[in-house]
């Protein structure tokens, strides 16, 4: 069988690949030969120098090292390792007792390298210097010759001498700053800070003349009241606070900012009376509702005439100043009618005399038919008043009992009977 003939292109590709592989193999052989022929004189010299340096260092404590090498690290006593760990910081040097012992040269080198960083890394607290040190700017890597260490001068008791010295220092610094180059970043800020720190504080003298300090104070009410009574509604001095409450019709109006008592001699008994004083025209009922202290006084009230409707006293009248408390912006009349509402018995007393006389008492009814009892019940419910109440007998029939001496006193209400 004849082999199929290859095209000339394929033959050229195969030949090129074979040549490439042959070249790679030849290059690898040359590299191997070159590496094997490299001279080893430098390695021998390095080893001899290390041996000599190690022998010189080990002459001092050779006996101690031989003992340590003779004992394996596993059999070493534990207290030796703990002592070494306490002497040497664990962060800087950690000894591993389980590692096999190294050669003498390696130990000598490690020990010499450990002693150097210990001496360099030991932190020492700097002593307190007399003058504060100002570091240069971050952009400058060296200390400029014109930069100085600024320090705060001691305070003297004499402010004038201190001020003159500060002025001289400022002038010298200003002259020195002109000569110094403009690229320094510390001079301008430091001069300003030193001037602000050392400048004396002028307390009460302005150009040698004493100056009165005006402090904002709140004027008292009696002072303002006396000024109003003497000078009218005009302010007396320029030091008083400016007020606009005198424009209002009354100083006790709720819109005023500062309420002042226009009567300095304020009576002690200034609380307002109960609103029940103003709800009836009868003097007898007024005397019944008064407190024991008010009963001793005459019942005539000139400030508030009696009325049937409880209302807040007028604030625009000057007479209402008697009813104001000594606390500003507070009027007891605003809370009396809300907290102490009038009792419902007050209007009932007025109509009791008219209705009790017109409705006669009904005698007790004997239980009868259902039609009679229903008629009696409807008549009783529709015709009873505040002074007449329903009573139930043993059979559940409502009975109307009129005002009499046996159950309820004449002219009294249910509330009075219950309270008694």
Curated annotation (Swiss-Prot):
Chief location: cytoplasm
Modified residues (Phosphoserine): 7, 72, 102
Subcellular localization: Cytoplasm; Nucleus
Phosphothreonine sites (modified residues): 99, 419
Entry's Gene Ontology molecular function annotations: transcription coactivator activity
Gene Ontology cellular component annotations, sorted alphabetically: cytoplasm; MBF transcription complex; nucleus; SBF transcription complex; Sin3-type complex
Region (Interaction with SWI6): 2-70
Disordered: annotated segments: 30-187, 273-319
Ranges annotated as biased composition (Basic and acidic residues): 43-55, 106-122
Physiological role: Involved in the regulation and timing of MBF-dependent transcription in late G1 of the cell cycle.
Further comment: Present with 319 molecules/cell in log phase SD medium.
Name the UniProt record assigns to this protein: Protein STB1
Gene (UniProt): STB1
